[in-house]
Amino acid sequence: MDQDFDLDEGAGQFNLKTTLMMFTSNDSQNDDGIWSPGSPYQALEDPSFLDKHFVSDPDRYTADELYSALEKMDGKSDLIGMDDMDNDNCYSLSPPDSGSLPISPASTSPSSYHSSGGEDLMDCYPSIDILQQASEELLYSKDDDYEICSSGPLLAYTNANSVATSAVHQNQQQQQRRLNQAGFPHQNSNGLVRFKSSQPRVLNPASISLNAPSSSFNPQSTSSTPATSSSSSSSTNGGFVKSSTGERRKYPPLRLDEEEIKLCKKEGICLPDFFPLTKAEERDLKRIRRKIRNKRSAQTSRKRKQDYIEQLEDRVSESTKENQALKQQIERLSSENQSVISQLKKLQAQLGQNAKRTTQAGRCLAVFMLSACLLVSPQLSPLGNQDNQKVLECIEEACQPSATSMNSANSAQRAIAGVTAPSVVIPSGGPVMVSTNANRQMNRNAVLNHHNNSKYPASGNQNHHPIALEDLNHPPPTLQPKQSYQQQHQPSMYRRSDETIAMAMAKIGARKGSSTSSSSASSVASSTSTSSATSPIYRTSRTLGAFEDQCDASSDDSNCANMPSLVPMKMSAQPPKRKIVTMNGQPRVTYRAVPASSVNVEQAQYYKVPQQKVQYVTMDRPIKYEVLQLNDYIKMEEESTIRLPNSWSTAGPRLHPQVNASSRTVRPLTVATPVHYNGPSAKKIKTQMF
C-alpha cells in the first residue's frame, strides 16, 4: 500500500463519512470490484449506517475513538465480511519500476533493479535472501495459511500521486498476466510478497502518525516494517524456519568453542547462533580461528624449544660430572706414570753399569786373540823362506834398468824361432832387424833379392850388423806374422806388473824343476802365447827382446843363452817421420817364416810379398802402430830414429827383467828358402795416438 493517508483534525472537526470513504477507497485500489453490486462497502452509502454505528455528533469522536470503533466493527465483521472474502494485503519489496520484467520466475527484483529510478530508495528496503525467497515462491500454495502482514501505518489522506500509484499497480498486474500466459508458474507480482491473515487484523494505534506532514514520506518507518516482518517470519526456535508456504527448514547451528567465544567478545564480534552467515561474518570467523591456530602453533613451538633446552641442560650436567671424574682419573694416572718412570730410570742405570763391565772384558779378550793369531800366522805359511827370497830377488831384478849392449850372435836365431810363435810384437820406434845364423841360407836369399844385398854379408855374426839407432839406411825386411783383422786392445809401453810376477814365478819353478812350478809356468806361458796370438803386445825395446816370454816359459835355460840384451829407446828433438808401405809402390821382397816341422830341405819354400808405396806422415808425438793383415806379413820402415824423452832415458828404471845372456844357449832355427809369391794381399793399417 503505497497510498499515504492522514487524519487531519482541523479544529477537532472532520467529516466522518468522508474519512470512512477514504479508508475504503484505499482498499479499492487493490480490488477493482470492491464497489460492485453486492459488495460490503456499499453499506457506507446507506445513511442509516452512520447513525447505527457512529454518533452523529462529530465533536465527540477523535482519531483514537474513530480507530477503536473501526476495530470493533472489523472484529464483528460488520463492515467487511471476513469469513466470506479474502483480504489480500501486499507491500512492495523493491521500488516501483514501470515497464520492467523479472529476470527469472525465482527473482524478486526486475531486470532494471539497479536503474537510476530505484537507486535512491535502496536503503529503505531490507536485504532478503534471494534463494530462500525463490524457494518459498516455487513452493507457493493458495490453500496454505498466510501470516499476518505487519504493514506500515495507514495514512488518512491520499496524496497527489495516488492516481500514478494506481497506474503502477495496474501495470504490475498486467505483467503477471503476461507471465502466466508465457507458461511461467503462478507467482505473485514482481517485488510483492503476499500474506494471508489467519487472525483478525489488529492495528496498533501508536504506529499511526498523526503529526506527519501531508506531502512527505518517511522511508525509515517504512523500511523498518519489512525488516521486522522478515525477522519474524524467519526466526523460530531450534533453528527451524517457517516460510510463507508453511515449510519448516532447519539450518545447522554455529558451534564455537570457549576460545572462539572469548576472542569474539574481546574483539566485539557478534555472530548468530545458526547458519547461514554473511560474508563479513564468515571473514571474521575465519580470522578468529586463524588467530587461535597461530596461538596454538606458537605454544607448541615454544614447548618444543623448552624441551630441547631442558635436554641440553641435562646433557651439560652429565658431561660436567663425567669431566670431573676423568680429571681425577688423569691425575691419578699421571702420578703413577711418574713413579714408574723413576723406577725405570733406576733400573736402566743399574743395567748399564753391568753391561759396561762385560763389554770391556770381551774387548780385551778379542784384541788379545787377534794379536796372537797375527803372530802365529807367518809360521804356518806353506811357502818356504827360500821361495820367498827368490820371489823377492826376481821382482828386484825386474825393476832394475838394463845396460846398453850389442846384440848377441844368436839373436837372429831367436828372432826367427820366435816368428813361429803366434804372438808377434811390433816395436813402437822402428822395424826389427832380423838376421839368420845360417850362412848358406842367407847367401842364397841375398842372391835372389833384387835389392841392395851388399849390406848383408855372408857372415852370420850379428856383430857385423850392429843396430844403428840413427842410421837412415833401410834395414833388412822385418818378418811379421800374418794376422787377421780384429778389435785390438790399447797397447802398453811397459810390461804389466802381473806379467812380470808371472814370469818370475815361472822362472823360479823352472830352476827348481818341480812338477808344480813347471805346470804353473807352462800354463802362464800358454796363456801368454794365446793372448798374444789374438792381439800383439808392444814392448819398449827395439831388439829381439820381445821374444823373451817364450824363453822364460821354456823349462830349459840353455835355449835362452843367445837372447840379446835390451836396448833403450831414444827420441830426437824433431818430430819423427814414419814410412807406411802401401800397395801403390813397386813390389819388394819380404820373408815369411815357416815352422820347422813343415820345412822340406829338398824343396825350399819361401814367399815373396810385394811391398807397398811409402807414405810420409809427420807427427808431433810418438805413435804406436797396430798392424792388421788378413793374408800375409808386411814390413814397416822408419825414416828417422825415434828418441824417447829425457824421462825415458837409460837412467830411469826399466820394468823389463834383467836377462843374463851367458846363461842362454843357442836355439835351433830352420828357415825355409824364399819363394816368389805374386798374389797381392789385402792389408789394413790402423794408427793410434797415445
UniProtKB/Swiss-Prot annotation:
Main location: nucleus
Annotated ranges, domain bZIP: 284-347
One of the Pfam families matching this protein, by short name: bZIP_1
Alphabetized UniProt keyword annotations: Coiled coil, Developmental protein, DNA-binding, Nucleus, Transcription, Transcription regulation
Region Basic motif, residue ranges: 286-321
Coiled coil start-end: 295-350
Bias type Polar residues, positions: 451-464
Transmembrane segments annotated in the record for this chain: none
Effect of loss of the gene: RNAi-mediated knockdown targeted to the gonadal distal tip cells (DTC) causes DTC migration defects. Significant reduction in expression of src-1 and tln-1 in DTCs. Causes slow growth after hatching.
Localisation per UniProt entry: Nucleus
SMART domains: BRLZ
GO BP annotation list: IRE1-mediated unfolded protein response; protein folding; regulation of cell size; regulation of distal tip cell migration; regulation of establishment of cell polarity; regulation of IRE1-mediated unfolded protein response; regulation of multicellular organism growth; regulation of transcription by RNA polymerase II
Residue numbers spanned by region Leucine-zipper: 326-333
Region described as Disordered: spans on this chain: 87-118, 166-192, 205-253, 451-495, 509-536
Keyword Nucleus applies: yes
Family: Belongs to the bZIP family.
PANTHER family xrefs: AGAP001464-PB (PTHR45996), CREB-H TRANSCRIPTION FACTOR HOMOLOG LET-607 (PTHR45996:SF3)
Main function: Probable transcription factor, required during migration of the gonadal distal tip cells (DTC). Probably regulates cell adhesion of DTCs via modulation of expression of genes involved in integrin-mediated adhesion, including tln-1, src-1, and integrin pat-2. Modulates expression of genes involved in protein trafficking during embryogenesis, including emo-1, sec-61, calu-1, sec-24.1, enpl-1, sar-1 and tfg-1.
Protein's name in the database: CREB-H transcription factor homolog let-607
Organism per entry: Caenorhabditis elegans
